[in-house]
Amino acid sequence: MIISLTLLILSLVALYIGAGWLVQGSSALALKAKISPLVVGLTIVAFGTSAPELVVSLNATLSGQGDIAIGNIVGSNIFNIGVILGVSATICPLQVKKQLLRIDIPVMLAATVLFTILFWNGTLGRTEGLFFLTGIIIYTIFSLFYSRKHGTEGPSQELEEQPKHWAVDTLAIVGGLVVLVFASRLLVDNAVSIAKELGVSEAVIGLTIVAAGTSMPELATSIVAAYKRKTDIAIGNIVGSNLFNILTIAGSCSLIHPIEAKNVNYIDLLVMLGISVLLLPLVKSGQKISRTEGFVLILFYVIYMFWLLRDTL
């Protein structure tokens, strides 16, 4: 078990590094194209930081481990809001822009409700997968057009101060993807091994260790953004990541191969839905998430973890 745990930790570190390269390269290219920072956070950064979840869930699906694939998606969405937004808000109250309130958060909630309904019986088929993927394509195109029409913010100061050739950014993207693919395979294999040795279900491993581990890029990105007072990136990253997790990851996995995950139950789905719904009144109160509200989100996650691990603690 020590070897499996060591390899799992190393795979998480590799996922973090690979996602970092991917985000750095893709964000630089997007900003050079004069896409606004908020939309970069909602799309490029969010999708890039969710790349670990994508490759891990795809690997798990192809290996017939649906509980890890779906547990990773559900657990990551809960972790993103409860821990990442919670911690970010305690560092700096998160101001919420109108686009997030009017468009992006409602779309995320709609996707979460839809996923909960469609996965209620513990399975996702190719029809649902195609529907989800169509949704993320429409959302991404809309966000990019909206940015072009309404966005006034140009490339970030950091990008202007440190110009790089597009080839360097492309190399970072390719290198990041290669690392992600190999690290994800290592993570899934050793997560399954640890689950068997501990006598816990693969769903619990997916909802906890795998979900938290694959969310490390989002955690780092949002915390750094909060410290720099770039709260639109911090929130946009999480909202975009949660959308990506449901529409792209669940969509891709179920389109490639129908998923069955009977051990991810309705309680887990309702917790994901509940913390997502809780986000709306929080951001509407003064159009920001305060430090107190950040602590509430963290507490929500801690209570869920105690319930989930009650039989193993």
Residue ranges of model-derived segments:
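Hydrophobic alpha-helical segments, chiefly the membrane-spanning helices
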Residues: 1-313
